[in-house]
Swiss-Prot record:
<dbReference type="Pfam" id="PF00067">
    <property type="entry name" value="p450"/>
</dbReference>
<feature type="transmembrane region" description="Helical">
    <location>
        <begin position="12"/>
        <end position="34"/>
    </location>
</feature>
<dbReference type="InterPro" id="IPR001128">
    <property type="entry name" value="Cyt_P450"/>
</dbReference>
<dbReference type="GO" id="GO:0020037">
    <property type="term" value="F:heme binding"/>
</dbReference>
<feature type="binding site" description="axial binding residue">
    <location>
        <position position="410"/>
    </location>
    <ligand>
        <name>heme</name>
    </ligand>
</feature>
<protein>
    <recommendedName>
        <fullName>Cytochrome P450 monooxygenase sirC</fullName>
        <ecNumber>1.-.-.-</ecNumber>
    </recommendedName>
</protein>
<dbReference type="GO" id="GO:0004497">
    <property type="term" value="F:monooxygenase activity"/>
</dbReference>
<keyword id="KW-1133">Transmembrane helix</keyword>
<dbReference type="InterPro" id="IPR036396">
    <property type="entry name" value="Cyt_P450_sf"/>
</dbReference>
<keyword id="KW-0349">Heme</keyword>
<dbReference type="InterPro" id="IPR002401">
    <property type="entry name" value="Cyt_P450_E_grp-I"/>
</dbReference>
<dbReference type="GO" id="GO:0005506">
    <property type="term" value="F:iron ion binding"/>
</dbReference>
<dbReference type="GO" id="GO:0016705">
    <property type="term" value="F:oxidoreductase activity, acting on paired donors, with incorporation or reduction of molecular oxygen"/>
</dbReference>
<keyword id="KW-0479">Metal-binding</keyword>
<keyword id="KW-0408">Iron</keyword>
<keyword id="KW-0843">Virulence</keyword>
<comment type="similarity">
    <text>Belongs to the cytochrome P450 family.</text>
</comment>
Length: 470
């Protein structure tokens, strides 16, 4: 997220930073010197010459780790610096936008914006997601988007609605298998929200891309997902994994990542070859044909499937399970939504497509109360912006929103909404649910503090609704 002035002098800048790092190691002077250097080189001021404020650089990753693992807390405390402030991702500044008028000014030309390379997350991250659709720009983005778009359009998502509704109901019918005490036949079961519901969006998206999967393939794919989750937990910790040195040092994180990349590649290629031998077609075989024709690269396909499947496992799980948890903690709203669903039983497809229902508003409210990330994937404008009175140079990275703005909105946003409603509707028809004791204390829910998104770690009591949903 460098200023364009210094894009033309990477060697000089690297030498200066390297010298400062050496001083840090040898004399313990680095933080003071480095902070002075960064403030000088990336100075952003308003018309009165007042510099843009923000937290001081924290060795060695700036605010990178805090942004991911303590984002909710820090998003409040850092606003003490003002409605527009600066944080550091290692040695790269990111400007954080919080006011609607600045959002409007920044996204006015969103079609020209550039995503940060590998989301400013470093070298090891780039090995699994560096070439994915969400993090590439320009002509590359257009090529890859064109290859994947046919499988995720609004029209296609609407056509899949009856299927996804049936799949959601089937999943809820079997959710008792995740009972924490093994009481699968009981009228009341206890579930962990994430453990019980995360597989539904994962395998639904997997079968959109891969086509029908056998039991062995599903088991293998889920093992890959668990490995991917472990890798992400280590990546957001920063440190040596940001640099290629992690490979030369053969760190355990690098070894695990290399194993995942090889196993993931093998799984995908072998499945595509199997489908072709059997005379079957799927989005996967279509994408491999695009690779053979040279329209996209294999890495672009693999990384974008990874983005849609593994990276978005936590994303969709977050939205779905927080909606369930929040409804569980607000029984009055839960009953109103349940009554609304019952009143629309004769035409659930139309009901699920509507944007003016309490169900839809509840989903939006859960996104507001429990946003996916306090800070979003950084992107940059291609011209200077005046925000809250500060002139921010082009190519400085910004943080903001949920599904994005303009043509770069999330590829699967329509499908994601349908998947979430496809679980919520049968769940509310079949169960009343509430939080178990000690899951919500002093205004705080139990959460997984190791994940890059703030997943809940909440257990629920699920009581079956008598036939008829009364």
């Amino acid at each position: 997220m460098e200023s364009i002035v210094y894009e033309t002098q990477p060697l000089l800048r690297g030498m200066v930073v390297g010298t400062i790092m050496l001083l840090c190691y040898r004399y313990g002077l680095a933080l003071s010197i480095l902070q002075l250097y960064l403030n000088f080189m990336y100075r952003i001021t308003n018309e009165k010459g007042k510099p843009l404020r923000g937290p001081e650089f924290s060795w060695p990753d700036g605010q990178t780790v805090e942004k991911f693992l303590q984002g909710g807390q820090k998003s409040f405390s850092w606003q003490a610096y003002g409605p527009l402030y600066r944080i550091w991702t290692v040695f790269r500044p990111e400007v954080v936008i919080t006011r609607p008028e600045d959002v409007k000014a920044f996204f006015f030309d969103s079609h020209t914006h550039q995503k940060a390379a590998s989301s400013n997350a470093g070298w090891l991250f780039s090995q699994i997601l560096g070439d994915c659709l969400g993090l590439i720009n320009g002509e590359r983005w257009s090529r890859v988007r064109h290859a994947f778009d046919p499988f995720f359009t609004r029209k296609i998502s609407a056509q899949r609605l009856p299927h996804i509704m049936a799949a959601g109901e089937g999943y809820v019918n079997e959710v008792h298998q995740y009972d924490l005490g093994g009481k699968q036949a009981a009228s009341t079961i206890n579930l962990n929200a994430v453990d019980a519901f995360q597989r539904f969006p994962f395998f639904y998206v997997a079968e959109i891309i891969y086509g029908p999967l056998g039991i062995t393939e599903r088991v293998e794919l889920w093992k890959l997902a668990e490995t991917h989750t472990n890798i992400f937990r280590r990546l957001v910790q920063g440190g040596i994994h940001r640099y290629k040195a992690t490979k030369f040092l053969s760190t355990s994180a690098y070894k695990e990542t290399a194993h995942f990349v090889a196993a993931w590649r093998q799984f995908t290629l072998e499945l595509a070859q199997k489908q072709l031998r059997e005379g079957r077609t799927s989005p996967l075989t279509d994408l491999m044909a695009e690779v053979e024709d040279g329209k996209v690269t294999l890495n672009e396909v693999l990384h974008t499937i990874d983005e849609s499947l593994f990276a978005n496992l936590d994303v969709t799980t977050h939205v779905l399970t927080w909606a369930i948890v929040l409804l569980g903690n607000h029984p009055d709203v839960q009953e109103l939504v349940r009554s609304e669903i019952k009143a629309n039983t004769n035409d659930l497809e139309t009901y699920m497509n509507r944007k003016d229902t309490l169900l839809h508003y509840s989903l939006l409210e859960s996104l507001r109360v429990r946003p996916l990330l306090a800070f979003t994937i950084p992107e940059s404008a291609q011209e200077d912006k005046v925000l809250s009175g500060y002139r921010v140079p082009k190519n400085i990275r910004y943080n903001l929103s949920t599904f994005g703005f303009g043509p770069r909105k999330c590829l699967g946003q329509h499908m994601a909404e349908n998947m979430i409603k496809a679980i919520l509707v049968p769940l509310l028809r079949q169960f009343r649910f509430k939080l178990l004791a000690d899951q919500y204390k002093n205004g705080e829910y139990k959460v997984d503090k190791t994940n890059w998104v703030t997943l809940s770690d909440v257990n629920l009591e699920m009581e079956r609704v008598p036939s008829g949903g009364s």
